[in-house]
A protein has these predicted regions:
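N-terminal membrane-proximal hinge/A-helix region immediately C-terminal to the signal-anchor transmembrane segment
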Residues: 1-75, 359
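Conserved cytochrome P450 K-helix E-x-x-R motif and the immediately C-terminal K′/meander segment
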Residues: 15-28, 275-312
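Cytochrome P450
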Residues: 41-45, 48, 52, 71-112, 119-141, 148-152, ...
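Cytochrome P450 catalytic core segment centered on helix I
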Residues: 160-228, 324
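Cytochrome P450 catalytic-core helices
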Residues: 238, 247-272, 371-391
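Conserved cytochrome P450 K-helix/beta-meander segment immediately N-terminal to the heme-binding cysteine loop
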Residues: 322-351
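Cytochrome P450 heme-thiolate "Cys pocket" and heme-binding signature region
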Residues: 345-385, 390-396, 403-410
Length: 425
């Protein structure tokens, strides 16, 4: 057994450290115990790996040996009603293929036109709050129809999705205790509220005789074999999981891209000048810097894990774990600061030399790769490009730091990042 396993006091200290600052906690344990160690916390045994060989081994397990899906579900189910997962027919992998993503581009542009009109000619906003609303508009406009991106429906849907937000289990782990204590009554109420709004959008489209071959229509076709009332419910629940999956990282990644540009005059000038591919590289670099994802594999059958020094037999029930924020900024020289030159397209540049590629991640590796990667990057690039074309910005902040308590997903900001804007026309 690697070092770190302990008794009740050790488990209590681990839980406290993880809640206060997960990244700093894992980094301290790594310095004290080495590249492979055990943490017992919150009823789980975590086998933590940070060596090149150990992290590569984590990503190499087959799903039936050590499950990524079950490990993630184990965290999300604490926040989301269990009946939301039953009967799903349309998954992110189904909807985010290369050809499918191209269908979203027009919807993203339409959603941005609505958002720019809502912002008006001048004002100010907090970047992460605005990005959250914008992320909802971009996502819902893409798979719930352009109607959902309108202010009429968006102002009803946003608070419902925010209440149901499964990423809260990662961003603010302590709040999950309240969800458990209340039996998820507020989350279930939000789920039913979204079901009613989606049914209303579809009914309005049908009563107006409108035929539109978008993803909302595709979702409804996939449930053609069930009664209309139940069909509305099942379509809405597919849509909820798809939207929640994209929003867990999209809006924070969008916010950090804009924040990093506002803090770097040189890169901002190059983006405004239209340097080819630069905005995409800024998005990937912003995600790399802000990643707080904890990668988990729940062991289902005994597996052998090689960390480069020795091989461990890992029993079922153990979570094999690494945390991206520990390695993303330390795996090679220069990765501790923002520089879009670290990327060529969606891959790290040849100048970034790593012991293994898995030590740095934005959207995951192998079966961990986020299916919404192309959609998310397209959404970020379109949104930031349209905002910069329309407005001049003045940052009312001089620094931005990731939220220290976050475990999972792309970080939210520790402090508000307020900007003033004025139309360029």
């Amino acid at each position: 057994m690697p070092p770190g396993a302990g008794g009740r006091l050790s488990r209590a200290r681990a839980a406290g450290g993880l809640l206060r600052d997960p990244t700093a906690y894992f980094a301290r344990r790594r310095r004290a115990l080495g590249e492979t160690f055990v943490v017992d916390a919150a009823g789980h045994r975590l086998l933590c790996v940070f060596s090149a060989e150990g992290v590569r081994s984590l990503y190499g397990f087959a799903e039936h040996e050590a499950s990524f899906g079950l490990a993630t579900f184990e965290l999300i189910r604490r926040k989301v009603p269990e009946d939301l997962f039953a009967g799903r027919r349309n998954t992110p992998h189904d909807l985010f293929g290369r050809q499918e993503t191209e269908r979203y581009l027009g919807s993203l542009e339409e959603a941005m036109t609505i958002e720019i009109e809502e912002l008006g000619s001048e004002g100010q906003f907090e970047v992460f709050s605005e990005a959250r609303r914008l992320g909802h508009r971009l996502g819902l406009g893409s798979w719930a129809g352009v109607e959902a991106a309108s202010e009429t429906y968006l102002r009803r849907l946003v608070p419902l999705f925010d209440r149901l937000d499964g990423s809260e289990a990662f961003v603010r782990p302590g709040r999950t205790l309240l969800t458990t204590a209340t039996g998820k009554v507020l989350e279930r109420r939000a789920m039913h509220g979204i079901e009613r709004v989606i049914a209303e959008i579809w009914a309005g489209r049908r009563s107006g005789g409108e035929e539109r071959d978008d993803f909302l229509a595709q979702l409804y076709r996939s449930f053609d074999d069930i009664a209309p009332g139940e069909r509305d419910v099942q379509v809405a629940r597919d849509l909820i999981l798809i939207h929640m999956g994209s929003q867990s990282n999209l809006y924070a990644a969008l916010a950090w891209t804009l924040v990093n540009l506002l803090l770097d005059d040189d890169v901002m000038a190059r983006v405004r000048a239209g340097e080819d591919g630069l905005l995409e590289r800024c998005a990937y670099e912003s995600i790399r810097m802000a990643q707080r994802s904890i990668t988990l594999r729940q062991v289902l059958r005994p597996v052998e894990l090689d960390d480069g020094n020795r091989t461990y037999t890992v029993d079922p029930g153990v979570m094999i774990t690494t945390m991206l924020s520990v390695t993303n900024t330390t795996a090679a020289d220069g990765l501790d600061h923002f520089d879009p030159a670290h990327y060529q397209g969606r891959r790290l540049a040849p100048s970034v030399v790593l012991p293994t590629k898995e030590l740095v991640s934005t959207f995951g590796h192998g079966i961990h790769t986020c299916p919404a990667q192309r959609f998310s990057i397209s959404a970020i690039v379109i949104a930031v490009r349209r905002l910069l074309a329309q407005f001049d910005f003045e940052a009312r902040f001089t620094d931005a730091r990731p939220r220290s308590r976050q475990i999972g997903g792309v970080a939210r900001a520790e402090e508000p990042c307020v900007v003033a804007y004025r139309s360029r026309s």
